[in-house]
Regions:
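N-terminal amphipathic/basic-hydrophobic helices that include classical n-h-c signal peptides
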Residues: 1-13
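N-terminal intrinsically disordered, cationic/polar leader segments
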Residues: 13-194
């Protein structure tokens, strides 16, 4: 008896994110097609497969996410899917963006059609294809990546940074805007300081 009431108590107090209704702004359409959440807006269309342990109810100007089971998995997915749905709605209205900086003497980047071309101190240029759904802009040594899908923007930004991670001695490489790279002393500098 106590265990049953404890389970109910846990499910009722679970997921502050999942419990909140999600506002659907004007000009945005949210629907469930087969087993997919489909969100359409001025910035495009996003789709995500809906897990069978989760239910999404769409009303006129709001949506809600609820778990269909009293399992640990469904409780975990409850907040996750609510966050995904919020991000999808935001993304089709206002694109997500990430900025990166290319640092280092002789290091540069240029936009060539649907590719980013980097000179990063290697014997060959590094070329990255810009994925569909992503927009890239280059201003001197700053790259701006934007798109409706928050995860896709983050993944592509991480791929760019991974082509030449900032090194800890001089800080050369590609870093996120505002990222602080903790610098190490070289052996000569450390010996001189001693």
């Amino acid at each position: 008896m106590r265990f049953g009431s404890l389970a109910v108590l846990t499910i009722n107090h679970m997921s502050r994110i999942g419990k909140r209704a999600i506002t659907i702004p004007a000009g945005t359409e949210v629907s469930i097609v087969s087993n997919e959440i489909v969100v359409k807006g001025k910035g495009g269309t996003l789709k995500r497969v809906l897990h069978p342990a989760i239910k999404v109810v769409v009303l006129k100007d709001e949506a809600s996410v609820t778990p269909l089971e009293r399992s640990r998995l469904s409780r975990a997915l409850w907040g996750t899917y609510a966050a995904h749905l919020r991000n999808m709605i935001q993304g089709v209205n206002t694109p997500f963006a990430k900025k990166l900086q290319v640092e280092g003497i002789g290091f540069k980047v240029e936009l060539a059609g649907k590719q980013l071309k980097f000179a990063l101190g290697f014997s060959h240029p590094v070329i990255l294809n810009i994925p569909a759904g992503i927009t890239a802009a280059v201003d001197k040594n700053v790259i701006t990546i934007s798109g409706a899908d928050k995860e896709q923007v983050g993944e592509f930004a991480a791929t760019i940074r991974g082509s030449k991670k900032p090194e800890p001695y001089k800080g050369k490489g590609i870093r996120y805007e505002g990222e602080v790279v903790r610098k190490k002393q070289g052996k000569k500098a450390a010996a001189a300081a001693a």
